[in-house]
């Protein structure tokens, strides 16, 4: 059975002080677990409070815990407690073993006596307790003498950690003029010590800096305003230092501090005020509408939305001539021109401008009216202005038959300045390119310069200029619109050529054609035309004219029995007159053709030649004749085609020396080069086609391209001869050093890809700075050997082909 040796340990601490000995007796116990219940023992309490009266109390020992103070700083190991077994006779036969958390590292045990010591500094904030196991063994045999027991060593807290503000420093805002006690912010400090033991973790708050403006609640850490009517405009920023002290703020407690930066936010507690009660401004009388005259400014000590201004003109004789707008960026009032100014009419204006806050707070209205006024004097300065027309627009109506030089309007302008300079008038020629009008330079009389024609130009829009004599740069202008009135100066006429048809079997009174007329004039009451036969045809026996009284007329026959063989065409002159003053008329001719018609009245033929054929020739006979002619034409074409495809003899006679050019026109060719071909007849010379004949050197500089013969070989022997001849000519051309290369495109039976040699015109001069390599010329054969020697990099001989 395990027993404790804690009583002797408590007595050994008597030298440390009576109170510590009492604390050790009451709170520090060491117990060991046992398989049997542990009896209650009586422990005499040596001290109780300050009365030091002796008392006796019963207490039940809890044998499974040890208590040890943290942060021990002595040089010797800290004694924790003692383990003892009832089977230990003190002869050293029992061996005590300690295992578990921190065994051998933090805690050690004397295996003979069972004394437990702490060999490292203990920190409760790092680890609050350790769980270990104890066992008693027979030293000689190693056999367990007691069952293994578990116990706990708890680390007793001491005040070794100061309070800390984990969220500091703090930033807070509170409105200015806030009542006393307004909450600003709450600060919180934490203490790492054990809050369940003593006062080590009990924190008390106090303010070290910031009085008398702010206070702090000692328990909650809430900061509040302590002074009324704190004005942001007087002081905006405050730095408050808060202290948190443990041990309930008692002497010896640890403390920590933090800084709280408090800003007073703005409220609208300051009315706007104009620092300048009178403004003097000036503006030119020629200033355009909305141009700026000047600026006024009302100062407001507030900021942001509380400093926004609104400017208005509340009084003055210039309220209708000027306007004021608020610049929201700079909170100034901008005075602008509202209507045109005139120095001659009014030389000065007075305005009363008010500046006010649009956003008000009711609780600060007692601080005074949140508006202010100022007076603005504006002087209008004289400028040299251009002449002004009265009225500002002219509309003139003039008949088109007005004579040249007639005055149609008097244009008037005057100088608005006090000097009243003389004025010269003119017409902007860009507005009157036809030069139909001119204006008197002095009087401004507008007159016609050319005949007017309403049918050509019915409206004229011109611009008349007025210029000061003393200052030609001052020019005024006015628009003049001239409407040309119509007079009856155009006769009516047919709108188109009329051609009518009449059947041979037409009856008297039959309608042939309805005609109408047009007139370029435009009378007020509209057009009205009158139709009749011309005087020279008044007694026409064939046709008559009936006026429909709606600007149209009908052409009717007077008789029947028209014959195409007798007269196939009639020309009927018709007189057309208008209703204008004076009356104008013209004569139009109606062409009437006589046609043969069937019984239904449909026109069959209007050509008189058909009646010249014999009467016995019917329509079927005529068709037969045309068919025979067509067959004969087909036979002729077949014969010509067969003759063109007739076979020619294989051998060309020596006497025949006919050459033809094969020209193809169904593809896109090369122009005149398409007419060039080869004379294949020359290839039939057997003397030059001999196999052993030496090639001749060409002496000409330009090869002649002859025409291609229309005879082609058709036997194998002939083909062999031609092939040999072509090879010989090819070899001769390749070996001829004097034959120049030709860069040309020949179109034969197809559209080719061009010359593989490229264009020699693209070769650059050897004296140029080009770094192009011309070594490829050596691969083009003997004809380009000279170029390869001149332009190639290699000096050696070109390869032979």
UniProtKB/Swiss-Prot annotation:
Three calcium ions are usually bound at the interface of each cadherin domain and rigidify the connections, imparting a strong curvature to the full-length ectodomain. InterPro entries: Cadherin, Cadherin-like_dom, Cadherin-like_sf, Cadherin_CS, Cadherin_Y-type_LIR, Catenin-bd_sf. One of its GO terms (molecular function) is calcium ion binding. Expressed in brain. Highest level of expression in the retina. In embryo it is synthesized by the forebrain, anterior neural ridge, developing visual system, primitive external granular layer of the cerebellum and a subset of neural crest cells likely to develop into melanoblasts. One of its GO terms (biological process) is homophilic cell adhesion via plasma membrane adhesion molecules. PROSITE patterns: CADHERIN_1 (PS00232), CADHERIN_2 (PS50268). Cadherins are calcium-dependent cell adhesion proteins. They preferentially interact with themselves in a homophilic manner in connecting cells; cadherins may thus contribute to the sorting of heterogeneous cell types. Residues 35-59 form a propeptide. Its main location: membrane. Disulfide bonds: none annotated. Residues 60-619 are extracellular. Residues 61-165, 166-274, 275-389, 390-494, 494-610 form the Cadherin domain. Keywords: Calcium, Cell adhesion, Cell membrane, Cleavage on pair of basic residues, Glycoprotein, Membrane, Metal-binding, Repeat, Signal, Transmembrane, Transmembrane helix. It is found in: Cell membrane. Residues 641-801 are cytoplasmic. This is Cadherin-20. The keyword Ligase does not apply. Glycans are attached at residues 261, 420, 461, 542. The chain crosses the membrane at residues 620-640. The keyword Metal-binding applies. One of its GO terms (cellular component) is plasma membrane. It is a single-pass type I membrane protein. Residues 1-34 form the signal peptide.
């Amino acid at each position: 059975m395990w027993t404790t040796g804690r009583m002797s340990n408590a007595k050994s601490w008597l030298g440390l002080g009576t109170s510590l000995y009492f604390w050790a007796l009451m709170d520090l116990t060491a117990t060991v677990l046992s398989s049997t219940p542990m009896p209650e023992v009586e422990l005499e309490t040596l001290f109780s409070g300050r009365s030091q009266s002796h008392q006796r109390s019963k207490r039940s020992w809890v044998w499974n815990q040890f208590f040890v103070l943290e942060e021990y700083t002595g040089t010797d190991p800290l004694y924790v407690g003692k383990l003892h077994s009832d089977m230990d006779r003190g002869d050293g036969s029992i061996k005590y073993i300690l295992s578990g958390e921190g065994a051998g590292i933090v805690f050690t045990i004397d295996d003979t006596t069972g004394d437990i010591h702490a060999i490292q500094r203990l920190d409760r904030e790092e680890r609050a307790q350790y769980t270990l196991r104890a066992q008693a063994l027979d030293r000689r045999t190693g056999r367990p003498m007691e069952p293994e027991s578990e116990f706990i060593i708890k680390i007793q807290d001491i005040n070794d950690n100061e309070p800390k503000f984990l969220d500091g420093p703090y930033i807070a805002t509170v409105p200015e003029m806030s009542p006393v006690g307004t909450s600003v912010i709450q600060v919180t400090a934490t203490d790492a010590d054990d809050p369940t033991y003593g006062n080590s973790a009990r924190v008390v708050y106090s303010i070290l800096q910031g009085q008398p403006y702010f206070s702090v609640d000692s328990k909650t850490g809430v900061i509040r305003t302590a002074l009324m009517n704190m004005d942001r405009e007087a002081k905006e920023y405050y730095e408050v230092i808060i202290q948190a002290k443990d041990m309930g703020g008692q002497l010896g407690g640890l403390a920590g501090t933090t800084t709280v930066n408090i800003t007073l936010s703005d409220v609208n507690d300051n009315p706007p005020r104009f620092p300048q009660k009178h403004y003097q401004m000036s503006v030119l009388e020629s200033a355009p509408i909305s141009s700026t005259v000047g600026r006024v400014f009302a100062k407001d000590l507030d900021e942001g939305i509380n400093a926004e201004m609104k400017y208005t003109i509340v009084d003055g004789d210039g309220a209708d001539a000027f306007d004021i707008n608020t610049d929201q960026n700079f909170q100034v009032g901008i005075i602008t021109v509202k209507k045109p100014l005139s120095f001659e009419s009014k030389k000065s204006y007075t305005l009363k401008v008010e500046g006010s806050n649009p956003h008000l707070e009711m609780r600060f209205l007692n601080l005074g009216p949140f508006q202010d006024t100022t007076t603005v004097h504006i002087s209008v300065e004289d400028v040299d202005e251009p002449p002004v027309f009265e009225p500002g627009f002219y509309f003139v109506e003039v008949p088109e038959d007005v004579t040249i030089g007639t005055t149609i309007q008097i244009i008037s302008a005057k100088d608005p300045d006090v000097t009243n300079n003389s004025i010269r008038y003119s017409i902007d020629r860009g507005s009157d390119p036809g030069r139909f009008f001119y204006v008197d330079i002095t009087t401004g009389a507008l007159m016609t310069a050319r005949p007017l024609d309403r049918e050509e130009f019915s409206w004229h829009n011109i611009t008349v200029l007025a210029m000061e004599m003393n200052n030609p740069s001052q020019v005024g202008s006015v628009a003049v619109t001239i409407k040309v009135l119509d007079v009856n100066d155009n006769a009516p006429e047919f709108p188109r050529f009329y051609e009518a048809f009449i059947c041979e079997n037409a009856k008297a009174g039959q309608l042939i054609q309805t005609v109408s007329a047009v007139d370029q004039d435009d009378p007020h009451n509209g057009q009205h035309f009158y139709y009749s036969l011309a005087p020279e045809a008044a007694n026409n026996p064939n046709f008559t004219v009936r006026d429909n009284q709606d600007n149209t007329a009908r052409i009717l026959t007077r008789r029947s029995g028209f014959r195409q063989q007798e007269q196939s065409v009639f020309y009927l002159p018709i007189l057309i007159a208008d209703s204008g003053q004076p009356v104008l008329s013209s004569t139009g001719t109606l062409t009437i053709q006589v046609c043969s018609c069937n019984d239904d009245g449909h026109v069959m033929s209007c050509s008189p030649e058909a009646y010249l054929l014999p009467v016995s020739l019917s329509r079927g006979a005529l068709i037969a004749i045309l068919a025979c002619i067509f067959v004969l034409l087909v036979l002729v074409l077949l014969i010509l085609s067969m003759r063109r495809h007739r076979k020619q003899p294989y051998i060309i006679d020596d006497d025949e020396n006919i050459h033809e050019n094969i020209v193809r026109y169904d593809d896109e060719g090369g122009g005149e080069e398409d007419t060039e071909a080869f004379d294949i007849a020359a290839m039939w010379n057997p003397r030059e086609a001999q196999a052993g004949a030496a090639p001749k050197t060409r002496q000409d500089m330009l090869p002649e391209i002859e025409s291609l013969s229309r005879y082609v070989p058709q036997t194998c022997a002939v083909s062999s001869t031609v092939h040999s001849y072509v090879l010989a000519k090819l070899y001769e051309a390749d070996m001829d050093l004097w034959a120049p290369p030709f860069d040309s495109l020949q179109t034969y039976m197809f559209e080719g890809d061009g010359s593989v040699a490229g264009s020699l015109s693209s070769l650059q001069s050897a004296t140029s700075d080009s770094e192009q390599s011309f070594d490829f010329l050596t691969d083009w054969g003997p004809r380009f050997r000279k170029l390869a020697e001149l332009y190639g990099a290699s000096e050696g001989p070109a390869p032979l082909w």
